[in-house]
Structure formats: C-alpha cells, structure tokens
Amino acid sequence: MSDLVSQNLNMIFKTPKGETVHALKDLNFTLKKGELLTVLGPSGCGKTTLLNITAGFIRPTSGSITLNSKEIDGPGVERGMVFQQGALFEWLTVAENVNFGLRMKKKDPFETQKKVDEWLEIVGLKGFGNTPTYQLSGGMQQRVALARSVSYTHLTLPTKA
C-alpha cells in the first residue's frame, strides 16, 4: 500500500498587516499507488503550500497528511519532487545527479548503475550519462530532474508533458 492521504488539511498564514489567509481549508483526498493528481487553480489558492506540506518542508496548521500510513513531518527520501527550476547539482554529471538519491538509500552500486541507465533511457537521455548537467538544454535538465526524482521513489513510470 502506498497511499498519500490528506485529512481535513488546513494551512493558515498571517499577512504582515495581521490579516488571516486560509491557503488550504479542510482539504481531503486519497491518492493511491499508480494514480496521478493534478492541482490547478489561480495564484494564491494553495498549490505550492500543498506541495510544501507534502514534501515535509512546512507543517499544516491542522489536519494531517500521511504517506503509507505515516504522518509526513519532515523531508524524506521516500518522496521525490521536480521543481520548476530543476535544482540539479551543476558540478555533477547527468548520471551522478540521477544516482544521488539512490546513493542516499545505500543501494548496491551495480544495481544503482542499472537503474540510472534505465531511467536515462526512459526520459530520452540514453548516452548522456557522462555529460555535465550545465551543458544541457532546459528541457533536458528537467528530464534529468524527473529521472532523479522517480529513480528512488515508489513510482514505476514517469509522465512527461
């Protein structure tokens, strides 16, 4: 089971003027393994706040969010994110970037190299493993970030726009 569950999730911020802003109000959802969720809405509706809570960067005002029945209370290696700006380690190669999360999980080096090669092929970057990431186009960097993110999470196949 790998469900992401939000129950009565609330996030309230105070503005510099002391006004109360409800970024999230009683948000409930269950996302099962293999499902994708798209969050759409106008600026300021809570999309980034939800991602920050899901990543464990901030704690909700009330309610809970759990992954595999464990409350998310901080960043963890069981989740991966791809930011609008890929957040790659520019001094590392493509393969080293993808391998980063796998090394954090202390996987066998032969197994990790095989996984890195598989993910680079899936995202269309086969043969780019030894390329420094700063030499790639923006779109290619996003694909490296996607491969790095999903290589060590529970996801099995990426979706690219």
Where are these regions (language model features)?
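The feature captures the beta-strand-to-loop junction immediately N-terminal to the Walker
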Residues: 40-42
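Helix-to-loop junction immediately C-terminal to a conserved catalytic motif
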Residues: 55
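Conserved ABC transporter NBD signature motif
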Residues: 63-75
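Short coil-to-helix segment of the ABC ATPase nucleotide-binding domain corresponding to the Q-loop/switch region
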Residues: 92-100
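Conserved ABC ATPase "signature" region
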Residues: 99, 110-128
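Conserved ABC ATPase signature
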Residues: 132-136, 140
